[in-house]
């Protein structure tokens, strides 16, 4: 099961590296989704719920989590209980924000799987190392765990080195340096593709890595185009 947070503008599912839930659902990686929708007023929830049901809800079972920060009252809970039926969800999960700290659940985040913060995809010097680190984590936790003889460790070393190299470039103070950074990132991805072709990785693992790399390259191209538009 996978849970995501959707703030009032609902854009966080695609704005951050670790929150492209719509893509993961569309690829069949999620069987049942518990998106948690935060809003200051209960009336805002139904609009967000409709958007999720119309998009992500087509690819997996949907159990909506609805929260009004610490404004929970019996009346609000009763209103929230019917939203999933209205939006076509398969169930409901009511929660209240303060409980994560009151009962010590925040410690799970500090020391657990999600200890690495999300990174904005246009953040020079942070996004690419985060993307490549995620690739390395996928290789470690999936490919090498399930099929240790698939050869993925050979490309993993190159991906990790590329992440360190891009992290060493640091941030960018202006659009000219941002453009240079993203162009270097594009070259890095081309080099990794060539290295993957020569690494002798098992075919199905190679195909999946190429798909993940293509997704990263799409974001690089989008950022290059955005910077070039600003520089005109």
Report the location of each language-model feature.
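Alpha-helical scaffolding within the catalytic cores
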Residues: 8-23, 43-55, 76-80
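Short, solvent-exposed mixed-charge patches
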Residues: 231-232
């Amino acid at each position: 099961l996978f849970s995501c947070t959707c703030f009032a503008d609902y854009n966080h599912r695609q704005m951050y590296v670790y929150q492209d839930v719509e893509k993961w659902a569309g690829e069949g990686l999620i069987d049942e989704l518990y998106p948690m929708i935060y809003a200051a007023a209960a009336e805002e929830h139904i609009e967000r719920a409709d958007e999720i049901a119309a998009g992500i809800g087509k690819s997996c079972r949907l159990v909506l989590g609805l929260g009004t920060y610490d404004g929970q009252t019996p009346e609000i809970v009763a209103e929230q209980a019917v939203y999933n039926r209205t939006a076509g969800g398969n169930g409901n999960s009511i929660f209240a924000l303060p409980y994560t700290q009151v009962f010590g659940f925040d410690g799970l985040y500090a020391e657990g799987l999600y200890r690495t913060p999300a990174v904005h995809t246009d953040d020079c010097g942070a996004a690419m190392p985060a993307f490549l680190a995620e690739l390395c984590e996928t290789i470690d936790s999936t490919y090498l765990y399930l099929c240790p003889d698939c050869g993925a460790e050979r490309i993993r070393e190159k991906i990790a080195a590329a992440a360190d190299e891009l992290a060493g470039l640091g941030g960018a103070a202006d659009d000219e340096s941002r453009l240079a950074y993203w162009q270097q990132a594009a070259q890095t991805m081309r080099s990794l593709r060539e290295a993957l072709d020569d690494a002798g990785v098992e075919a199905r693992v190679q195909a999946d890595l190429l798909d993940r790399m293509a997704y990263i390259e799409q974001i690089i191209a989008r950022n290059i185009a955005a910077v070039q538009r600003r520089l005109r």
